[in-house]
Regions:
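Short glycine-/polar-rich loops that comprise or flank the Walker A/P-loop
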Residues: 68, 135-137
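Generic recognition of flexible, low-complexity loop/linker segments
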Residues: 26-30, 59-61, 108-110
Length: 163
């Protein structure tokens, strides 16, 4: 997780005369760099994901909240736009189920491409057809059982949580 967040970090650069350019001091202005990762965490709220698995997902997100701030997006066949919230760094939460239904990875991928996240973490049981390509880095998180028996093959990173 830590490596995924560090590699998904976007840098905002601006010119400044107060910070000197190391290569050409006092000739060219320097750059001020601000790095911040915009991570979208997409939680599968379908009926195939039971409450025990959701509790494990939220336990992992509590650990992830020590590293970075991220946006939590619940989905089943559609993204629940009214249930999206930002999980601040250092915050801790308990799990909540807000949707029940089937699973489709097309709508969260479209949402991630539209919102322009630097990284996409999908917490799911991988029981849906293979999604389309994503513009940002995508990582899958599931339990060990579903990691050994995925519904589709992917070259993207799959992280398994112990059962």
């Amino acid at each position: 997780l830590r490596y995924f967040i560090k590699t998904s970090t976007r840098a905002n650069k601006r010119s400044t005369v107060r910070r000197l350019n190391r290569r050409f001091p006092r000739i060219h202005s320097g750059k001020k760099v601000q790095r911040q990762a915009r991570i979208g965490v997409y939680i599968d709220q379908s009926g195939s994901v039971d409450d025990g698995m959701l509790a494990k997902f939220y336990a992992e997100l509590n650990k992830l909240a020590n590293l970075a701030e991220f946006t939590v997006v619940p989905f089943d066949t559609q993204v629940a736009e009214d249930k999206i919230y930002v999980w601040k760094r250092g915050q801790s939460r308990t799990f909540e189920r807000v949707l029940t239904g089937g699973t489709c990875f097309r709508s969260p991928t479209d949402h991630c491409n539209r919102e322009g996240f630097d990284g996409m973490i999908v917490l799911t049981d991988l029981m849906a057809p293979k999604p389309q390509a994503c513009k940002s880095q995508r990582m899958w998180m599931t339990t060990e059982y579903y990691a050994k028996h995925p519904y589709f093959k992917t070259s993207e990173l799959i992280v398994a949580i112990p059962d």
